[in-house]
Curated annotation (Swiss-Prot):
GO terms for biological process: lipid A biosynthetic process. Pfam families: Acetyltransf_11 (PF13720), Hexapep (PF00132). NCBIfam families: lipid_A_lpxA (TIGR01852), PRK05289.1 (NF003657). The keyword Lipid metabolism applies. InterPro entries: Acetyltransf_C, Acetyltransf_C_sf, Hexapep, Lipid_A_LpxA, Trimer_LpxA-like_sf. Belongs to the transferase hexapeptide repeat family. LpxA subfamily. It is found in: Cytoplasm. The gene is lpxA. It comes from Burkholderia cenocepacia (strain ATCC BAA-245 / DSM 16553 / LMG 16656 / NCTC 13227 / J2315 / CF5610). This is Acyl-[acyl-carrier-protein]--UDP-N-acetylglucosamine O-acyltransferase.
Length: 262
């Protein structure tokens, strides 16, 4: 049986699984869908065309599914889609998409979103991502799986953050971070490969060694980006465990629109 506090407001039309818990003074809008075993904290607002999967925990005073902070927005029925097993802590704000993009903001599975984080319209957050307290994502930001964003960091709109990368606290990021790379500073600069994170996630010694070699090619050998990409493609075909991650690195660089941090 759904446990809804008597002070909570659940508007007609909301689709709420019978195992959901909704705390005091929370508000759930008419176009919201909430999956099994999800908990909605007190005073939080779940609005817009928002879908929450299963086993999510929404903290107190979170605002999920709000209108995009985009002056072009004209009340189109854009969406927010959140997967399963996410923790979204207190005072976090996550906005729906805009029609200028694909119209959907997405958050995958198993993410840890700490207090006061902002995820702007049209962001695409993957799986197993950590966004530390007060990290701020502008619109259209893309974050790959297992990325970690330090607290008090700001990320410019349309920036892409590669899988398994890490952005240090209080950083300002205005260009893309390639996968596997650590970055920090204002503005953020590269500081090596995320070796410890890769070890924890089961990357082999050969794969990590190949990524270290790729990092030297990209950042330490004095090459232009185009020259570096030629050598990176050679590394990606060397054979062994390092081929796939180095290939992923090259593909990310090739797809970059804002350019990568250098």
């Amino acid at each position: 049986m759904t446990r809804i506090h008597p002070t909570a407001i659940v508007e007609p039309g909301a689709q709420i699984d019978e195992s959901v818990e909704i705390g005091p003074y929370a508000i759930v809008g008419p176009h919201v869908t909430i999956g099994a075993r999800t908990t909605i904290g007190s005073h939080s607002v779940i609005e817009g065309h928002t879908t929450l999967g299963e086993d999510n925990r929404i903290g107190h005073y979170a605002s999920v599914g709000g209108r995009p902070q985009d002056m072009k927005y004209k009340d189109e029925p854009t969406k927010l889609v959140i997967g399963n097993r996410n923790t979204i802590r207190e005072f976090t704000t996550i906005h729906t998409g805009t029609v200028q993009d694909v119209g959907v903001t997405t958050l995958g599975d198993d993410n840890w979103i700490m207090a006061y984080v902002h995820i702007g319209h049209d962001c695409r957050v993957g799986n197993n991502v950590i966004l530390s307290s007060n990290a701020q994502m502008a619109g259209h930001v893309e974050i790959g799986d297992f990325a970690i964003i330090g607290g008090m960091s700001g990320v410019h709109q349309f920036v892409r953050i590669g899988a398994h990368s890490m952005l240090g606290g209080a950083s300002a990021l205005v260009q893309d971070i390639p996968p596997f790379v650590i970055a920090a500073g204002n503005k953020a600069e590269p500081h090596g490969i995320n070796v410890e994170g890769l070890r924890r996630r089961g990357f082999s010694a050969d794969a990590i060694s190949a990524l270290r070699s790729a990092y030297r090619v990209l950042y330490k050998n004095g090459l232009s980006l185009e020259e570096a990409k030629v050598q990176l493609r050679e590394l990606a075909g060397a054979g062994g465990d390092g081929d796939a991650p180095v290939k992923a690195l090259v593909e990310f660089i090739d797809a970059s629109q804002r350019g990568i941090i250098r």
